[in-house]
Amino acid sequence: MNRLQELHELGQSTWLNYMRRSFLQSGDLRARVAEGIQGLTANAANFEATIAAEADYDEAIWEQVTAGTPAPAIHRALIISDVQVAADYMHTIYQESHGLDGYVSLELDPVLMHDAINTVAEVRHLEAQINRANVMVEVPATPAGIEAVKTLTRDGVSLNITHVFSVDVYERVAQAYIDGLEVFLDTHSVWRFTPTSVVSFSVSAIDEAVDPLLAEKGERDLMGRTAVAQARQLVGRCQSIFSGPRWEKVARRGGRILRPKWSRTTPRNPAYADTYYIEDLICPNTVTTFSLDTLAAFLTHGRVESHVAAWPEQAESHLQRVEELGINLDAIADRLQQEYLRASEQQFQAITRRISRKREELEKAWQRAGVHGTAVHPAIMTELPTQRPAVR
């Protein structure tokens, strides 16, 4: 039994924040699943870097270029294709876990972050296009996003609610989820599977924001502990919300709790152990998310121990000290959400620009081949006899 399998024995699911076409086609995904990975989340930054530096998507981009597809639509088509392939591969896990794991999660265009109506419409559209049961669409936990969570849960859609940096925001999301789940069970449960959703709580970003404030106040002994304390407090809040008569009625009808999903678990501070957040947040009924590097580190030298019973007291003690220092964690959480939402929007724009540049590179290669008869990428050669790109 390896370390991921030990986490499974303790009731924690293990997902990977990585996806690119060669990863899906080469057998690397198969190897990670064999190690114990149970879900995937697409990473926009990695997607852009792959398009820029690798040939994974050249053939697919060229096919879209020759069809006259604009760059934003090319992005969408590439992601949908990857998600479909990954979801098909992960479907066995989805079935064996009875819909708890085996999901592939993809980002929603951040331009919709403050628009509940169009968020709902776009998620429904994506779900229909992808047409896979084990797909989660990521909805940011803005006020509009939380409103959309209620509507989409009512419709039976599984979601990954993102950009959560505080326990209070998790609680608001959880209440919307329960409200939607109750309606779903009253109206749709006879013909649709009950949705399974998670909330991505960003870990390392919190310490990155709080640690400099602690250092300024001479409280270095508190550094690197705030994110873990908040995550542990969130687990306690989750246990409280998903208990009692109201929830028990929902659970008896097949409702599942809104599991916390630990994201950004790679420490930003090199002084912290590379497996620090993974090891300190081992808990049943949660999902922990690995980067490739953190996964390799944890499989090599990670510790698997869980002391959940001590978490409430430890978390309360630390957070009380932080509050006494005048550090406003709610304000920091709000700022982090806004910063990361802006970063997500910029990342999507960067992908569109990157695809446009790649399109130009492929068109120039086509033109050079036509003039000089030089060798070009095989993806282009397959199209040369019959097609010419539509220039936009």
Residue ranges: model-predicted function:
Residues 46-47, 53-148:
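Active-site beta->alpha loop and helix N-cap motifs at the rims of alpha/beta catalytic domains
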Residues 65-73, 197-207, 212-214, 221, ...:
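Conserved N-terminal alpha-helical segment that immediately precedes and caps sugar-phosphate-binding
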Residues 157-293:
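Catalytic alpha/beta core domains of metabolic enzymes, predominantly
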Residues 43, 106, 137, 152, ...:
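Conserved, mostly hydrophobic/aromatic
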Residues 17, 133-142, 157-169:
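Catalytic beta/alpha-barrel core
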